Amino acid sequence: GLDRVASTQNKVWDENLPDEVIDFIKEIGFERGCYSANINVQRPGQMAPLHRDNHGYACKKLNKQFEDFERVLVFLTDWEVGQVFGCEKECITDWKSGDCYTFDAQDQHFSANTGIETKYSIVISVLKEYIK
């Protein structure tokens, strides 16, 4: 995965999530003990190159293995021209705020914001048994 320290300025980590975000994740259907999450803030000109996450924090927090997790990406803002999220061979654009995308823990993925508006999303590492 990407270096946690290198991307700290662009994230709100699980241990610092506001109550409103925790409540929102609960509304999606995930109780606090089944996930680890962070808010991604991607400003214009920023990107997260192609990578696989190691889910290290989630594994440690929930005492589970890497293979036990799936990722859920929730877009918090509507898509703007110049923004893209990619997972394996698929590139996603034109999302609406609240749209969710689920992918396997081992999938390669990336994100780029070449537009003029900041992109906000929540990334959730959730135990597979809780995915409906």
Set out the residue ranges of the language-model regions.
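Conserved short histidine dyad/triad with adjacent acidic residue
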Residues: 39-67
